[in-house]
A protein has these predicted regions:
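Short, hinge-like loop/turn segments at secondary-structure boundaries
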Residues: 5-9, 28-30, 55-57, 81-86, ...
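Class I S-adenosyl-L-methionine
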Residues: 1-66
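General beta-strand structural signal in soluble alpha/beta enzymes
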Residues: 40, 65-70, 116, 141
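A contiguous loop/helix-start segment that scaffolds small-molecule binding in enzyme catalytic cores
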Residues: 34-35, 113, 117-166
Length: 166
């Protein structure tokens, strides 16, 4: 979008591995009364995104944080799912290794709609693991929302797993 709209500004990368020096540089920039936009290449900043730690630092430094509402995969998916949305639990990304099975097991007794994020290369494995714990329940997999290849697959674990195995 930045290139499309010919926006010419400094860009700084911020991620899980950003150093204290990089964080301090951004905070100094903000303290100098400069405006900064936190954007993400995958959804809403700070939602299952390392941006929350920068926000936390801004708050501790008493730097104003002004949210600008926009597209969110979480709300887009839940609104198009057809599943109950009066109460839902947002899980975010499951751990990739340590604690993964424990986290999945902890979902068993939740009686709300569950919303998870998952990468395409782990999706099938995750669906199978969730099915073992949650049984055959209605599910929706929504991906590439609002993009050219948007896809919303509704069914249960069995039918959805078959869909992705094909």
């Amino acid at each position: 979008l930045i290139n499309h709209y010919d926006i010419d500004t400094k860009l700084y990368s911020y991620h899980d591995h950003s150093s204290e020096k990089e964080i301090a540089r951004l905070l100094d920039f903000l303290k100098d009364q400069k405006d900064v936009a936190l954007i993400s290449d995958a959804g809403t900043p700070t939602i299952s995104d390392p941006g929350y730690s920068l926000i936390r630092e801004c708050i501790s430094e008493e730097i104003d944080v002004v949210p600008i509402p926009g597209a969110s995969a979480l709300t887009a998916a839940i609104s198009a799912s057809g599943l109950p949305s009066d109460a839902f639990t947002f899980i975010g990304f499951l751990p990739t290794k340590k604690g993964r099975q424990k986290k999945i097991s902890s979902l068993e007794n939740l009686d709300t709609t569950l919303v998870l994020f998952e990468s395409p290369h782990r999706l099938l494995k995750t669906l199978n693991q969730l099915k073992e714990v949650l049984g055959e329940r209605p599910i929706v997999v929504a991906r590439e929302l609002t993009k050219l290849y948007e896809e919303i697959i509704r069914g249960n674990f069995g039918t959805t797993i078959k869909y992705f195995e094909a």
